[in-house]
Amino acid sequence: MRKSSCKMGTNSNTLVKLKNAGYQQNDKWLVKGVSLEVEKGKIVTLIGPNGSGKSTTAKIALGIYKKFDGEVEKYTNKIGYVPQKVSIDWTLPLRVRDFMVLTESLKEEAIDEALSLTGVVHLKHKNLGNLSGGEFQRVLLARAISKKPELLVLDEPVQGVDFTGEIALYELIKKISEELNCGILLISHDLHTVMSATDHVVCLNGHVCCSGSPSDVAKIMSIKLVG
């Protein structure tokens, strides 16, 4: 595997672009041949089964992997990230406000603004261990947008939430994209749930199976299932 560099530059709309990107571990490809582009104010969703390379693709875009195949062009360093798993000792008396500033300093105004946008400012002084799954996901989103990112990467941001909560969170994600004019790279397991909140879909299974608008991808997948 050759080392590929991330390029920085100026572009009116593009925030990150992957060109034939891939990553292998222990001589096994986790994902390969992925090309996609995330623009300001647009939501690109990666869907696919477990182990299909969704999280790996997101980490390539984020620059977490220093060695990968293909090319990544990034046009912003203002990036927010919600990982798939967050390690927290739930026995600690950690308030939402403390969690918001756990890894970096924030002004109180920025904390309140982010929590307000995600609808949980009333939980600011509540312990994390007392939050529901949906409330915690909203707090994670608030922390990710607290510094007004241009690019937001969300890895399964509705996990641990019931169906009604999922719909509400996807609506919130769309609202965040519109209000902050940020591009979003979203990982989801269910195309039908996320359809109304995304602009472009990339279906992965170790490689790109298909891509396009949500309706186009849904048609392709239904044809494959019927066929």
Question: For the regions a protein language model found, what residue spans apply to each?
Answer:
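Conserved ABC ATPase "signature" region
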Residues: 108-123
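Conserved ABC ATPase signature
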Residues: 127-131, 135
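Conserved catalytic motifs of ABC-family nucleotide-binding domains
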Residues: 148
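Catalytic Walker B motif of ABC-type/P-loop ATPase nucleotide-binding domains
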Residues: 152-156
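H-loop/switch region of ABC-family ATPase nucleotide-binding domains
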Residues: 188-189
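Conserved beta-strand-loop-alpha-helix hinge in the C-terminal portion
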Residues: 207-227
